[in-house]
Each structure stands twice: as C-alpha cells, then as structure tokens.
Curated annotation (Swiss-Prot):
This is Mu/omega-theraphotoxin-Hs1a. The presence of a 'disulfide through disulfide knot' structurally defines this protein as a knottin. Residues 22-48 form a propeptide. The lineage of its organism: Eukaryota, Metazoa, Ecdysozoa, Arthropoda, Chelicerata. Residues 1-21 form the signal peptide. Lethal toxin with multiple biological activities. Inhibits voltage-gated TTX-sensitive sodium channels in DRG neurons (IC(50)=55 nM) and also shows activity when directly tested on Nav1.7/SCN9A (IC(50)=25.1-630 nM). Inhibits N-type calcium channels (Cav2.2/CACNA1B (IC(50)=100 nM)). Also blocks neuromuscular transmission. In vivo, intrathecal injected toxin shows analgesic activity in the rat formalin-induced pain model, without induction of motor dysfunction in rats.
Length: 81
C-alpha cells in the first residue's frame, strides 16, 4: 500500500514537471517567432536586380525577373504564360 502511494505521488510530480516544461516552451514560441520574423524583415530592404511577381514595373523596360513580364494593363510583373 505504501509503495503504490509513493508511485502515484511520484507519477503526479513527474506529470507536473512535464506540463510545466511544455507550458514554458509554448510561452517562448511567440517571442521566437517574432524575432525570426523581424530578422528576415531586415533583408527586405536590399534592392534586387530584377522585380518579382506583383512588383510595380514600367511596361517595355524589361525590369521583371526571368519568366516574368510586365503587364500593360496592371503595371506589375506577372508570370509569363
């Protein structure tokens, strides 16, 4: 009887420790996600040699990346079909 009570108590303590550890990881996840987002956002300031899909362009100037063309109607780069 005494051994089963000890095992039950040890199991509850172990369950508490596991739940606490997973909860603390969940609290850190949004913070890590924001840090990663802003770290990637720093690279967006660099100028590219060509323009990607949906970037503004001037028709006839060939500013878009390969396999893309500047739309005369919308004035942005789109996939060449």
């Amino acid at each position: 009887m005494r051994a089963s009570m000890f095992l039950a108590l040890a199991g509850l303590v172990l369950l508490f420790v596991v739940c606490y550890a997973s909860e603390s990881e969940e609290k850190e996840f949004p913070r890590e996600l924001l840090f990663k987002f802003f770290a990637v956002d720093d690279f967006k300031g660099e100028e590219r040699a060509c323009k990607g899909v949906f970037d503004a362009c001037t028709p006839g100037k060939n500013e878009c990346c390969p396999n893309r063309v500047c739309s005369d109607k919308h004035k942005w780069c789109k996939w060449k079909l």
